[in-house]
Each structure stands twice: as structure tokens, then as C-alpha cells.
């Protein structure tokens, strides 16, 4: 989960572009409360690069916190921008 000024700053699109460039699979979506949620899967070094990127985000973002959890892989293919879930 990424907190701060992370919506309305092209966070999701930039995240997708970076993930595709890194060869990382997963997804990213806005949450109703203003945060962004993402899942990254791939080689550990590439996932680490994505998490490092999430701490900065795109130029207009102001990231205040990144919460990271290790979970069982879902064996995703590609990287998607998902719709915001209903509150």
C-alpha cells in the first residue's frame, strides 16, 4: 500500500510502465481512501526495484509511506491497472 499524494499524479500508469520495463507482473489500483495498492511478482531484485520506485513514485507524487507484505505468488501474467474497488 502506498500512501500520500498518490492519486491524480499518474502513479498507476507510471507504475505499470516501470513494471513492464522491469519484467515484473502484477497489478495496481487506486483505493477509495486515497491510497494506492499494488502487487508485484517476479525475480526478487526486480520486485525490490519496483518497491524502491514506489517510495518515490512519479514526479508529481508525494509518497509518505509504503507498506510491504510478502505473500504467496499468484502466478500473474502481465501488469494491469485495475479499477478502484467500491468503498
Please tell me what each predicted stretch does.
Residues 1-87:
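Intrinsically disordered, low-complexity, mixed-charge
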Amino acid at each position: 500500500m502506498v500512501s500520500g499524494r498518490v492519486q491524480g499524479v499518474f502513479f498507476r500508469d507510471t507504475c505499470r510502465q516501470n513494471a513492464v520495463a522491469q519484467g515484473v507482473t502484477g497489478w495496481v489500483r487506486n483505493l477509495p481512501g486515497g491510497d494506492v495498492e499494488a502487487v508485484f511478482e517476479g525475480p526478487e531484485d526486480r520486485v525490490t526495484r519496483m518497491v524502491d520506485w514506489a517510495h518515490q513514485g512519479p514526479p508529481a507524487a508525494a509518497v509518505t509511506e509504503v507498506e510491504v507484505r510478502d505473500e504467496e505468488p499468484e502466478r500473474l501474467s502481465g501488469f494491469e491497472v485495475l479499477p478502484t474497488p467500491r468503498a
